[in-house]
Amino acid sequence: MKKLFAIIGMLMLVAFSIQAQKTYALLAGVSNYGDPNINLSNTTKDVKRLNTIFKSQEFVTAMITSQNANHDNIVKKLQAIVRLAKPDDKIIFFFSGHGSPGGFVPSDRSFFNYQELVDILKKAKAKNVFCFIDACMSGSVKTISANNFGIGNNYPRICFMTSSDANELSRESSLVGNGFFTKALIKGLKGMSDKNTDKSITLGELYNYIYKDVVHRTSGSQNEMHPQLLCPDSMKGIVLTKF
């Protein structure tokens, strides 16, 4: 009987541990840069649609858009999440807006360097951090030393999935209602990327689906896009969503 109670107790502890794990997501999108010549159409939609998906997964989400998505606000929100997240939690950062070599552009038109982003995220106790960047030239994050992304048993392990390569523009489309990358990201998270049909979406499955979808939709156009994945191989099997 004691052995039975011990087994039940262990199962309850495991169940509680699984339930206690959280995913914190900060979603930032800039449509309005204060200039009609550079304003974007779908970035706020990108954020809102992703937020709906993440909330359905019971993620703890924070959403900042347009003028609120300035450099200082993004930093403050990220730092708050970094302080909250525990080792078994996950952190997700998503940005949709303009980009340039080495970083992305918040609403105040300042420059948010990818190295600065990594420096903030490296302070997290959470073991796994995921960044999804839908911005021009976002693949330029590859210029950051691989030592910044977690090697071997070093934590946190940081993943970047970007909409385009370092020398490519990222596009949005009124026909799909989102950026090409974010549209594929949304479809993938909702189940289209579940190659082995186990009702779970891993990072590797998600990237493979996004890459094929985006390349297919932009192939032959003036601005082809080739999404990039930069992360330790050990992260590719991590489950991001279930459906």
What residue ranges belong to the model's regions?
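Cysteine endopeptidase catalytic domains of the caspase/legumain-like
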Residues: 16-243
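Sec-dependent N-terminal signal peptides
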Residues: 4-14
